[in-house]
Every structure is written in C-alpha cells, then in structure tokens.
Amino acid sequence: MAKKQSIRSRNFRRSDPAYDLDSSTAIENETKLSVKEKVAKEIANIALRSGGSESNGISKKKKNKKQTSKKAKDKLAAALKAQAREERLDTKISKSLQKQEKLKARKQGDE
C-alpha cells in the first residue's frame, strides 16, 4: 500500500521550482531531460525519502523502534529461561538433599 504524502512534503515540492508547473524554467528543464533521466531522478528522490534501498520502505524511526522492542523481547525471554533453569536446579538440589537425609535416617534406624 502506498504511503500517504503529508501536506508539508507536498507543499515543499510545490514550492520547489523543479516541481512548479507554472514556472517557465521548470518547463524548459523538463524538455531538456529525457524520459530515462526523469525516471532516474524520481527514483532517486523516492529512495532518498524512504531512507535507502536496504530499509524496504520502512522509515528509520519505525525500524529502530521495532529493533529495540525486539531486543527487549529477546532479553525478557532470555531472563525467563535463566530463571526457569535456576528453579530446576534448585529443585534438583533440594530433592537430592532430601534423599540423602532419608538415607542417613534409614542407616541410623538400622544401627
């Protein structure tokens, strides 16, 4: 889906003499440029506005926000895994201690 242009950017392009259709210099410039040059210029403008080809149309601010939220989720998941590991270790230790105590009690009871 195409991104809706803001009024501010539209007004900026309208005030630019290169985009001004009423200006005679803009018409002269258009006649001098070939179709390939016009297309290349428009593609360059779009790429500049979108933040480059590597961003795939996602604005830099939005991309950074997604990355930070993803990093936060990863950190939270890692912390939860570590906590679960710790709990399992604690239960193993407590079970082994209980088993040792039972064995000691049996040995004392036998003697």
Curated annotation (Swiss-Prot):
Keywords for this protein: Cytoplasm, Nucleus, Ribosome biogenesis, Transport
UniProt family annotation: Belongs to the ECM1 family.
GO CC, one annotated term: nucleolus
Cited InterPro entries: Ribosome_bgen_Alb1
Subunit structure: Associates with the pre-60S ribosomal particle and the nucleopore complex.
Keyword Transport attached: yes
Compositional bias ranges of the Basic and acidic residues kind: 83-111
Annotated protein name in UniProt: Shuttling pre-60S factor C23B6.02c
GO BP, sorted A to Z: ribosomal large subunit export from nucleus
Cell compartment(s), UniProt: Nucleus, Nucleolus; Nucleus; Cytoplasm
Location of the region described as Disordered in the Swiss-Prot/TrEMBL record: 1-25, 47-111
Role, per record: Pre-ribosomal factor involved in 60S ribosomal protein subunit export from the nucleus.
Pfam family, one: Alb1
Organism: Schizosaccharomyces pombe (strain 972 / ATCC 24843) (Fission yeast)
Biased composition (Basic residues): 1-12, 59-73
